[in-house]
Design a protein with these regions (language model features):
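Glycine-rich, hydrophobic membrane-spanning regions of integral membrane proteins that mediate transport
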Residues: 1-199, 205-227, 233-249
Length: 249
């Protein structure tokens, strides 16, 4: 097999193409580059780089942000459906926080489409109107993330209660084996909840600044966005390629 064939048929390339064949996989890739460009534009400006260098990075960031908005057109309907389905969840706290999260994200994405219309110049809003749209979009995104963090905090509490109960020894060997399996399941669930809460906490900084609740600089926001983009990419990579594929990555 030639060197070219080895490269083209390499398992890692196949996994990457499988990852990029999904809308989420492409979005996480674009988002990673977008926030990296955001950080680099801030870094180069602070370092005293030329205006052309900084502007190129800002243009890259803006182009990717606009492209991602186009990819999200109509996605608010998914969140409205998810909010409706969340009403069937038995645990009231999980149900209410899920509804709040999905409605927050859905409302954010509706305003996100208006931002795309303005950015693509398909329709131009006045400077005051687009500023208001952007600020309200950030508020709704922040609302969705806040409900997600509340849900994560509650799930952490429930899992700790389950973990304490699962640590008690059982009377029979069969029950003891079941207990060990349950312990592993709880630990896996805890890891997932902690991972999501870390991602949400970092993402929270971005709309909190956009909504003017915080005043963080572009460098911090760029790094926070890059970190959560890579975390989201990891989750999607595992979903597409499985844990073995994630380990290879």
């Amino acid at each position: 097999m030639s060197a070219l064939q080895q490269i083209v048929l390499h398992p890692y390339l196949s996994q990457t193409l499988r990852f990029w064949s999904t809308t989420v996989g492409r979005d996480k890739t674009y988002r990673s580059v977008q926030y990296l460009a955001r950080f680099l534009a801030w870094y180069e400006y602070r370092k005293g780089a030329t205006k052309e260098t900084v502007q190129r990075l800002q243009n890259l960031k803006s182009s990717l942000a606009l492209s991602r908005k186009l990819m999200r057109v109509g996605k608010f309907l998914e969140h409205l459906q998810a909010a409706l389905k969340a009403t069937a969840i038995q645990d009231p706290i999980v149900s209410y926080t899920a509804i709040g999260r999905q409605l927050g994200y859905g409302s954010y994405l509706i305003l996100d489409q208006l931002q795309w219309l303005h950015g693509s110049k398909a329709y131009q809003f006045s400077p005051e109107t687009i500023k208001k749209i952007s600020k309200n979009a950030a508020r709704f995104w922040l609302t969705g993330l806040s409900f997600s963090l509340i849900s994560g905090t509650y799930k952490t509490y429930v899992l700790r209660q389950r973990l304490a109960a699962a640590k008690r020894p059982r009377a029979t060997a069969e029950k003891e084996a079941e207990r060990k399996i349950e312990l592993q399941q709880i630990q896996t669930e805890q890891a997932g909840v902690y991972f999501q809460m870390t991602q949400d906490s970092l993402d929270w900084l971005i709309p909190a600044t956009g909504a003017e609740f915080l005043d963080l600089d572009e460098g911090v926001l760029g790094l926070a966005g890059l970190a959560t983009s890579l975390m989201g990419a990891r989750t999607q990579w595992r979903a597409v390629n499985g844990p073995a594929g994630a380990a290879k990555k």
